[in-house]
Curated annotation (Swiss-Prot):
Binding site for S-adenosyl-L-methionine: 132, 186
Protein's UniProt name: Putative pseudouridine methyltransferase
SUPFAM superfamilies named among the record's database cross-references: alpha/beta knot
Keywords attached to this entry: Cytoplasm, Methyltransferase, S-adenosyl-L-methionine, Transferase
UniProt xrefs under Pfam families: Methyltrn_RNA_2
Compartment list: Cytoplasm
GO CC annotations on file: cytoplasm
Broad class of where this protein is predominantly found: cytoplasm
Protein family: Belongs to the methyltransferase superfamily. TrmY family.
EC assignment: 2.1.1.-
Organism of this sequence: Shewanella baltica (strain OS185)
Molecular function terms from GO: S-adenosylmethionine-dependent methyltransferase activity; tRNA methyltransferase activity
Cross-referenced InterPro entries: Alpha/beta_knot_MTases, TrmY, tRNA_m1G_MTases_N
Any Gene Ontology biological process: tRNA methylation
Amino acid sequence: MRAFVLRARSAPTDSQLFLASVGQEPHTEILAHTLMNTIFVAQSHRNDVVVYLVLESTHDFSRTICFDTRNICHIGGFHEQALLTKIAKALDISRGMTKEQTRVVDEGITVSTISFEKLVQDLAVDYQLFMMDKKGTSIREQEFVGNPCFLLTDHIPMPKKSFNTLKRLGAQKISLGPKMLFASQCVVLIHNELDINQ
């Protein structure tokens, strides 16, 4: 099983603000692009992937939306608008939730009020954690054992204090090459390497 976590530090947890932020400073379209490239293949979707979108621009708690492809039946289409609508629906369903609650959005999709840090702590139990770093081990030289989990960010870099927490949890740095890439591009390269080596 492959897991991907996209930490969207500027993405609003209010559904209307989220939708209004497409193409604006928060760049919420990044979530749809990354989700699209993580889940879908031509004429179908992968059935061995879990994607966590962590939206952090909030007045109360971060929202973590989980897409588990083993259980997803219908997501509304392969296009950006369908994915943005699904994320907005999850945010609407999350209204009024208290800390560390989870609600079902649709088959294979849940929304939780857990932070990025708590999510990664939980994932570290079952997954081998990787964070992107130009100075890390090349993905082509990295050995993947068990279930890999890849930690990505939107256009706002990961805070330095998060790196220390991730290191303590055993996260390893991997490189996809010398260029800084969009999260949506990273997932394509990661999938390709793992597919080739399966």
